[in-house]
Amino acid sequence: MLLLLRPETASIRTPTASRAAAAKLFLDGPYGARFAGEISASRQGYFSSRIEVLAHPEDPDFVQTIARQHAIGVTSGQRFLLASWRGVPVTAFAASFLDTSVAIFMLESSGLRRPADLVGKRVGYRRASEGDVVFDAMMAQLGLPRSQITKLPDRGSFEALEAGEVDAIIAAIDEQPDPSNPTFVKLNVIKPQDYGIHVPGLVYFASNDLIHDRPSLIADVLQGIIRGWQFAYRDYAQSVPVLAGSTGLPTERLKFELQQQRSLVLPTGGRIGDYDESRWRTLRDILLFAKLGEEDVPLARAVTYQFVRDVYRRSPDLAAPGAWSEEK
């Protein structure tokens, strides 16, 4: 089947790129550290089948695109679940970021440190973003008056924060400036996880027909991605040059972003790719609270845990302590 790709879609060049791909894995964003597992799996040959990994940023109908292309994708848990509720025929089968990467940043000099400090302040965010919903859920969980917070759309950049246009911003943890930068300004960070908000961050999903017709392919892709994440974090001296060749990021910036997201991919005592039902229930509840959709498709139909269980059962070495070590 010939795929009609958007102009900005680009694939990673691999030795098998000229051969017909068994499936395509689309990334909801540009190549970068947050897709290090997928990039590593492709570049290091961890996929048994020929899987083409493609960056597919800025597609407002990303989940629908995956369903239409009979493909595999990775996007935010929020974006996936809302599309599933709208009837897009897709199923999530594993986690990339086991928790949200959303954080709230303030200048250290402001003295703002806790969620309660944000009452009466200006908070910048990106319109229709995951961060906006997670922030509201955190404030509601803490019983803080959201009506007393001035939220400014499209002011969610670190430039806006440093310029004093806002008192805090909602952004992804891996987007923060590198402390080694000469112009770096010290920041305070609030993580929603520290206040009981745990939701799936990035998730892997596929069209329902691909999952039903080719389950062994999904299992192969998942195993390859797990090995890819292990490679990314086992030794930066090996992985960063490989990843830099695909992402175009400076090596130090790439290493910094990998460090920032490490706990989201490799949680203490957890397994790469694993997620639990409680995180999905929390995400469902906060989306309903935000009135962003109706649960027309129950979680039991939108999410499967079987692929993760099967992969680790068949290859227990993937979860062994020696499978990945502390970053070097």
Regions found by a protein language model. Give the residues of each.
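Secondary-structure end/capping motifs
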Residues: 214-293
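Short, glycine-/small- and polar/acidic-enriched structural segments
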Residues: 13-152, 158-160, 167-173, 186-192, ...
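Short polybasic/polar patches that bind polyanions
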Residues: 42-43, 84, 140, 181, ...
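Conserved C-terminal helix/tail region of periplasmic/extracytoplasmic solute-binding proteins
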Residues: 288-328
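Pocket-lining segment of extracytoplasmic ligand-binding domains
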Residues: 78, 156-248
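Short linear loop/turn motifs
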Residues: 52-55, 256-262, 297-309
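Short amphipathic alpha-helical segments at helix boundaries and their inter-helical linkers
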Residues: 73, 165, 260-277, 304-320
